[in-house]
Amino acid sequence: MTYEILDHESDIGIMVYGTTYEELFSNAVYAMADLILDVGKLKEKRKMHEIIRGNTPEDIMVNLLSRVLFYVDTYYTLYFRATCKYEDSTLDVYLYGSEIPEEVEYRNVIKAVTYSEIAVKPEDGFARVIFDL
């Protein structure tokens, strides 16, 4: 399993696993998408290239997931797979996903990615992210 769900007061969180920054960022994209919808029911039909910057790995995690959430809210497109390269405070990422079908039932409606309790620690094998619902 690449992630687990964390109960967090009125919010929800994820703990993702990986031993590199790239694994943690990619697994976080999948985990957040799977919190929103059952991604097993979607097929990859869209591809998007993004350059994400931040001062810290935690900034990049928040910026990356916020960008994925932007596409959900604005274009009704859910990106649920990512391939990426992390170097010098920059994440070069390709996102893969699908338009959200009209008849789909949302698991959770995520309003925002937060800095609350955030951690990105490949040396310890995990990253933690909390979302506002």
Curated annotation (Swiss-Prot):
InterPro entries: Archease, Archease_arc, Archease_dom, Archease_dom_sf. GO terms for molecular function: calcium ion binding. Keywords: Calcium, Metal-binding, tRNA processing. Ca(2+) binds at residues 11, 132-133. Signal peptide: none annotated. GO terms for biological process: tRNA splicing, via endonucleolytic cleavage and ligation. Belongs to the archease family. Activates the tRNA-splicing ligase complex by facilitating the enzymatic turnover of catalytic subunit RtcB. Acts by promoting the guanylylation of RtcB, a key intermediate step in tRNA ligation. Can also alter the NTP specificity of RtcB such that ATP, dGTP or ITP is used efficiently. This is Protein archease.
